[in-house]
Structures are given as C-alpha cells and as structure tokens.
Amino acid sequence: MGTPFKMERGVKYRDAAKTSIIPVKNIDPNQELLKKPEWMKIKLPANSAKIESIKNGMRRHGLHSVCEEASCPNLHECFNHGTATFMIMGAICTRRCPFCDVAHGKPLPLDKDEPKKLAETIQDMKLKYVVITSVDRDDLPDRGAGHFAECVKEIRALNPGIKIEILVPDFRGRVEQAIEILKENPPDVFNHNLENVPRLYKEIRPGADYEWSLKLLKEFKAVFPDIPTKSGIMVGLGETNEEILQVMQDLRDHGVTMLTLGQYLQPSRHHLPVARYVHPTEFDMFREKANEMGFEHAACGPFVRSSYHADLQASGGLVK
C-alpha cells in the first residue's frame, strides 16, 4: 500500500495534484480535446501597463483577485478597464472542484487586517462598484460569513456611495448563521453560483448540493427582499439545453432576478474537458428565455462570467 496523501497547510495544490484526489472523476490528461471555435478566440490588448498596475497593487497590499487565481479568460479586458474581482480569505480553497483553477489545500488562518487593506486598495483604485468573492472555507465555524461582513463594513467606511456585490460560497451547513451575520452589513447585490445542472453535481461540484445552494438564495431573499439576488451557470460540461432552462426556472422560483450564463473553458488538461462549445446564437436564445421567465437582468454569452461587467449588469446594461 502507498503512503496516504497528506496536505501541508498553506501549500497550493493545483492541476494534477488537485484533481487526482477527487474520488468521483478520473481525468485523462492525454485525451483528445475539442478544437476551440473562432468565436472563442481572445484578442489581447496591445498595452499591458494598466494590467501590470492592478497586479502590482494587489501584490503590494497582499490581496488576491479571482481573475488571476481562477485563470479567467477576461482578465486582460477587465484589468485593462481598471476593474477586478477581489478574492478574500486567501487563495487556497477547501473544495476541489475539477472545473476550477483555484488551488486546493489547507488554508492559512484569516488575515484580520484584510478587510482594512481591501478597503484602502479600493479607495486607491477609486472604484464605484466592487465585487468581492472568496474561496470556500469549510474549516471556519461560520464558513467565512463574518469576514465577508467585516469587509463590507470597512469598504463602506472608506468609500461612501460605493456599490458592493458579494459572490459567496454555499456556507455549507451554516446558511441561517451566515445570513444572520450579514444582517448588520448587507451587500447591494448577493451572488451565489449554481454553476451547472443537478445531474452533474457529484462530478462537477463534489462537496456541494444543488438544493443547499437554492436554499441559500431563497433564504437571503426572504430576509432582504429589496436586495437583488444573482446566480451564474456554466455551459459545456455535458448538460443539455433543456437542463439549463430548468435550472434557470429553479432560480426564478427561488426569487433570483439576475443571471449570468457563459461558456466553460478547461483551465488545464488536468481539469474537466469541454464537452461542447455553445454557439453565440444559443446564448441569445438563453437570454430571450431568461427575459420570458422574468429575470430583470440576464448576461448570456461565451465569455460571460459571474462578475464580468457586473457594474453594467447591475445598472441594467446589456452584457454578452
């Protein structure tokens, strides 16, 4: 017998080191991959000065962006426009979803100064709309809800008039506690992603539960009826269009009014492969269906991600 795998605290496990310890799915890194269609080609900006400026600002304050940690395809566009999605509570996630490029492992203790550093960075960047997300922190008693609340509090104290969107984990087993903690410092938009369809959850989101996520969205809306709730879905992981439409309807049935829907892209050969590339006309169909279902805002397109042009979506602009 081999020696059992033991993780070291604070070490980032990525790619094969991460996905090899997922019991549900064996991923063959040598499998033949789908060719990326023309509409999925990204044109990089000629000038990277703004991009490097934001990266350096993050490093200087000891902060992380989900844009970098999750290898988002929109990083160059967003950073070039001076926007970023901040990722709090470290860069090591206690979950190991095989679609995600964020590192897995045993996280370090929370940085108690992070909320203040985050608020100061946002002030320096002169942001009017900010998205705050996090890794999953199943090691924390409140799953990180208190840290979210403290970040919102500090950001508002230094940045009057700012709009804050939080993209939260599922607070596994602590939904009621998390919502209670957020009562003192609620966000302007509450976002939690379903990611994909329930049939594929065991394979795509090990450790998560479709009904838990719907419950979180519903219960937050019940406590804060005037705060928009939002959720995101990836396509191209083996789901059908009919299943996606059912997830969209489930979201509406649970009070969600804002939707993001984009194409899944494989971060590396050690992650889940792309099962299909969805044509832009299909995304247009999903947006039309979302409007028919009663979503107030639906951003649907190949490169759409949860926080992609979040400020524009929150103000009612078209994002695709």
Swiss-Prot record:
Cell compartment(s), UniProt: Cytoplasm
This enzyme's EC code(s): 2.8.1.8
One Pfam family hit: Radical_SAM
UniProt entry keywords in alphabetical sequence: 4Fe-4S, Cytoplasm, Iron, Iron-sulfur, Metal-binding, S-adenosyl-L-methionine, Transferase
Chief location of this protein within or outside the cell: cytoplasm
Keyword Transport: no
InterPro entries xref list: Aldolase_TIM, Elp3/MiaA/NifB-like_rSAM, LIAS_N, Lipoyl_synth, rSAM
Catalysed transformations (reactions): [[Fe-S] cluster scaffold protein carrying a second [4Fe-4S](2+) cluster] + N(6)-octanoyl-L-lysyl-[protein] + 2 oxidized [2Fe-2S]-[ferredoxin] + 2 S-adenosyl-L-methionine + 4 H(+) = [[Fe-S] cluster scaffold protein] + N(6)-[(R)-dihydrolipoyl]-L-lysyl-[protein] + 4 Fe(3+) + 2 hydrogen sulfide + 2 5'-deoxyadenosine + 2 L-methionine + 2 reduced [2Fe-2S]-[ferredoxin]
PANTHER family: LIPOYL SYNTHASE, LIPOYL SYNTHASE, MITOCHONDRIAL
Protein name according to UniProt: Lipoyl synthase
